[in-house]
Amino acid sequence: MILKSELLDVHTRLGQMLPFVTKRFASVPTAMRTRRRTRRHEREPNLRKRQGGSHSNLKENEDAELKFKLRQMNEFAKNLKMQMQLADSLRRKEEAARAEGIGGDVAEGAIERDSSTVAAALLEGAEPAEAQPAPLNLSQLIMSAQNAEPLLAPELAERIGDGKLVYSALVNKRAQNWDAIVAALYESAEKLRGLDADIVKEKLLLRVSGLSLEGVATLDKLLTDRFGEGRDFDVDMYGVLFETLGEHTQHTQQAKTVVDRMKKLLQRYDACDDPDKKPLTQEILNCCLKVGTAAKSFDDMNYFLSKFVKDYRILPNKVNYDQVLTFYLKNRTLSQAWETFGAMKFMSLSHRPDVATYNLMLQVCDQERNYSKALDLYHEIQDLKMEPDVRTLSMLAKAMASASTDAIVSEGKSDSLRLTGWKFIHEIENNPKYATAKDDPVCAHGVLTTMMALASYDGDVGLARALFYRHAVQSYKKLMKNANMDAVSNPAAAARAAWTQAIDPVLFNYLLMAYSRYQPNKLPILLGYELGAKFRRQLMFNVDYMGRAESDNDMHANIPLLPVMELSSTAEVLNESRALWEFFLSKHINGSLQPQPSARVVSMLEEYRQNHDTFEGFMKEVKSQVKRWQWHAVNRRLMTPITIMSYLSIPLRLGSYEEFAFRYKQTIYTGNELEESVKNFYDPALVTVSDEATVVVDDSEVKVEKYARKIDDRILQIYSFAYKNRVYNDVFELAMKAATKFRDNSLATRVWKERGEFRKTEGYTSMSVKDRIAGDTSFACATVKFFVAEKRFSEAMAVIMSSQKYIDWKYHMVRELHNALVSIEDSVSIRKLLSVVNKQNRLKVLNTESPSLTP
């Protein structure tokens, strides 16, 4: 910028050189003080230019710049890796097709046509179109000089003799079908005979994966046919079998079957008397412990541990001890988990607990709702100079959330514990070193579950809805993308099936808990500080409940959530929770839990009634049919005892008696209700209309229509049980609490009678003694509280005195009754009540009141 004095000097000199030019003065406008394009500087920070300011500002700027660069590099590496994998997969497919003689020329022409598409996508940083992938990228340039590996070793492919089978089974690296390869080898004439052991291990055993239980049995027969059951069947082959069997731990019953097969393999290994046979390994022991954990069997775990220690001289290592901790965690034997964890600290350095072990113990703290132990473990991690990972911070926050639900455990600091949990979540979100770990689906789901727990226990319905909706829509779109809707004849039915699979039962239960804890006048804890308010606002603004985005055009159906960010009344909470329950649990295309039986159902019931001469046989047939209907009509993956309790707790806590009665009738049924409905349909006396039809001829059609309508109502009543769940212990306790809150004496009487009838059913007698006592204790406590609320103290005392032999009464169970007796100064009842509660005085009371047996 030219200053004014310099400008005057220039004009003076120009005037001296050019006398005929008139001197003029010009005013030059100054530059604008406002800086432009600030958004560009914020989005693309300059790492070389250091801005001035305090040390704290410099540190914050450096952290932000480093975080930005890390995200940029991770995104670039992710795109590059994806393109390399795509090109490598296509190259291998083409070379395998050429080796098998399947369409080589056609595939080569397709590669040449699609090369420009992939090259352009790499330059632009975008994904190529799925229909036109091309392998001309960096991966192909690097591997162009290498020889292509065949999908299957030539020695094995020759024995199969079917190139198309090999190609179709192994061409997709992400979903290879080794069951077909193993079955084809076993059905071949030569099988594995004549092949060297090294070739079998390298070309088959090291590559095989994802075998079913039948495939593992076939592979075992294949190896036994070649190597026998003696010395030639070495440890490496046993290791492959055990490792493949260890993958089948999805269900407890399946795990028990796998345990039996593992025991047979160990018996076969013991039957070999060769002194030079190789010993088993720690990996095999860990596979056995993994399956024993899934089977939830103490006997199986003791069998494997004792056998490997005594017979094979293999002591458990740290990985094995972690598996033992997982077993204790699943079986809720938490005291033994603490003992094992304490023993690991005093073993060798190789057994010292690491972050993974501490994460398991944080889950134990979560189950115990012990936040103090969780914080102590976190301080131990810091003192040992170990680096906590995302799972560590997530489990810490989860333990804080669980402890905040119990007023006694939290010591009146529920909000402080939830605030501490949210601080751990903020550390995960804002720390750059956890940026890459959050891309792991397991870690991301764990953080999401923890956030849902914190929001639900705080009653933050707005945040819980946003998190649930975002996860549900993402899962639904992924399922619909894989479903290939163009080839589906009924898109609405496919969308309904996708929604039933997209919902996580744990997240759905947390959303129901958030509804039940809703308070219109309560401020969410995140709004109490600036960072939390900003974090909550960002999450809620990223959700579009209306589905107006362009990517939501193909959703075919949307979740029935109100198109608002925050719910403003209990009526909205009740209506939305009921709509979600019916939408997700019903497998019907319209999402309704009010079924209409088809003509096939009507004819089936009529046929059952005609084929059975006795009511008992008809009742047995209908019960089995109702169970089959329940699996096909309702999404049983979501309709669990836990979600049912959360669903029924919403109107109970919000104080809506009509809504609670409607949901209870819609969701729960007893055995007597089913029996009465079936008897009403079966008994011929209830459906005889011949006399009425012959009295007046003109009214015959009216009588017949009335008769048909009654039959339809009975069938509808029977079919409605397919959409309900049979009553169980916790439901009786919840119903008694509802009778206490709503002061409904008739409901309490009915629940008391139904609970007595439930004790005679097979569902109660099949329970363990521990579970039966726990159920009786909780229901007795709820009954005592009802009698106290109704000021029927003598009946409350009768319940306690009659059950003291089976129930271990504590003072916190009878606190309300004791305070009520003190208020009316009933000293006799107080003395009896304290004698039952106080364990030390029980023996004295029995000795003084019971008659002596000696003269």
Swiss-Prot record:
Protein family according to the UniProt entry: Belongs to the CCM1 family.
Cell compartment(s), UniProt: Mitochondrion
Assembly and binders: Binds to mitochondrial small subunit 15S rRNA.
Organism (species): Eremothecium gossypii (strain ATCC 10895 / CBS 109.51 / FGSC 9923 / NRRL Y-1056)
UniProt GO BP: mitochondrial genome maintenance; mitochondrial RNA processing; mRNA processing; positive regulation of rRNA processing; RNA splicing; rRNA metabolic process
GO cellular component, one term: cytoplasm
Official protein name in the record: Mitochondrial 15S rRNA processing factor CCM1
Further comment found in the protein's record: Involved in mitochondrial-nuclear incompatibility, a major determinant in reproductive isolation between species, through hybrid incompatibility of Ccm1 and its interacting partner 15S rRNA between yeast species.
GO molecular-function term, one example from the UniProt record: mRNA binding
Lineage of the species this protein comes from: Eukaryota, Fungi, Dikarya, Ascomycota, Saccharomycotina
Keywords, in A-Z order: Mitochondrion, mRNA processing, mRNA splicing, Repeat, Transit peptide
Function recorded in the entry: Regulates mitochondrial small subunit maturation by controlling 15S rRNA 5'-end processing. Localizes to the 5' precursor of the 15S rRNA in a position that is subsequently occupied by mS47 in the mature yeast mtSSU. Uses structure and sequence-specific RNA recognition, binding to a single-stranded region of the precursor and specifically recognizing bases -6 to -1. The exchange of Ccm1 for mS47 is coupled to the irreversible removal of precursor rRNA that is accompanied by conformational changes of the mitoribosomal proteins uS5m and mS26.
Pfam family name, one: PPR_2
Secretion signal, residue range per the UniProt entry: none
PPR repeat residues: 234-265, 317-351, 354-388
Coiled-coil regions, chain positions: none
UniProt-annotated stretches for the region Disordered: 29-61
